[in-house]
């Protein structure tokens, strides 16, 4: 059936990605992080990895729509969500929505930007430019909200820590 390992792994990845598909209340097809759609939401970090490493299994328009879904659910100050559930609940920090693990994740906007970058690499530049123009100000605002120390590094205050993933150092 398969002529090589790469073909087999691509087929397996496609099946897993297909199992991640859920339809949100607003009709947006989103991708959950677990391959069986039991997580009821779009996690920006996991989706970014999915697009980068198994994006061949996701139509460009679904990626565009997931980015739009995330941007629509940013906080009033511009902070991007950690995840957005199928019913539209935006959650900004790791953990249970009612009991977050620290302040909002420091990597929400950076991972959304990684997704935008992955999309840009697979689209014709002329087709991508209007999308980037649509998102640029919101992505920039999300980046400018990140706490930066005197050396220009993302800063995670140990007295009031954000939920980190690896883009920060805690003092």
Question: Where do the PLM segments sit?
Answer:
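Soluble or luminal CAZymes and related metallo-dependent hydrolases
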Residues: 4, 131-134
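Short hydrophobic/aromatic segments of transmembrane alpha-helices and their interfaces
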Residues: 31-33, 45-46, 136-137
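Low-complexity, Ser/Thr/Pro/Gly-enriched N-terminal "stalk/linker" regions
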Residues: 1-42, 64-65, 69, 78-80
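The feature captures the catalytic groove of carbohydrate-active enzymes
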Residues: 30, 36-38, 82-111, 117-121, ...
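Short, solvent-exposed positions on alpha-helices
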Residues: 61-64, 126, 130
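Aromatic- and histidine-enriched alpha-helix N-cap/loop-to-helix transition segments
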Residues: 38-49, 58, 103-114, 134
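Alpha-helical scaffold segments in carbohydrate-active enzymes
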Residues: 11, 15, 69-76, 118, ...
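Alpha-helical support elements that line or immediately flank enzyme active sites
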Residues: 46-77
């Amino acid at each position: 059936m398969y002529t090589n390992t790469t073909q087999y792994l691509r087929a397996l990845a496609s099946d897993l990605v297909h199992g991640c598909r859920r339809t949100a209340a607003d009709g947006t097809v989103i991708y959950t992080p677990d391959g069986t759609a039991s997580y009821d939401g779009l996690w920006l970090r996991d989706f970014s990895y999915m697009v980068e490493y198994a994006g061949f299994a996701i139509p460009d328009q679904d990626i565009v729509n997931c980015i739009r879904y995330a941007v629509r659910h940013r906080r009033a100050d511009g902070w991007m969500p950690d995840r957005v559930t199928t019913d539209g609940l935006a959650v900004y920090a790791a953990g249970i929505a009612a009991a977050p693990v620290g302040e909002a994740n420091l990597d929400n906007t950076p991972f959304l930007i990684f997704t935008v970058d992955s999309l840009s690499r697979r689209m014709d530049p002329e087709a991508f430019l209007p999308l980037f123009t649509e998102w640029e100000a919101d992505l920039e605002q999300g980046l400018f909200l990140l706490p930066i120390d005197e050396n220009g590094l993302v800063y995670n205050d140990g007295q009031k820590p954000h939920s980190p993933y690896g883009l920060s150092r805690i003092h």
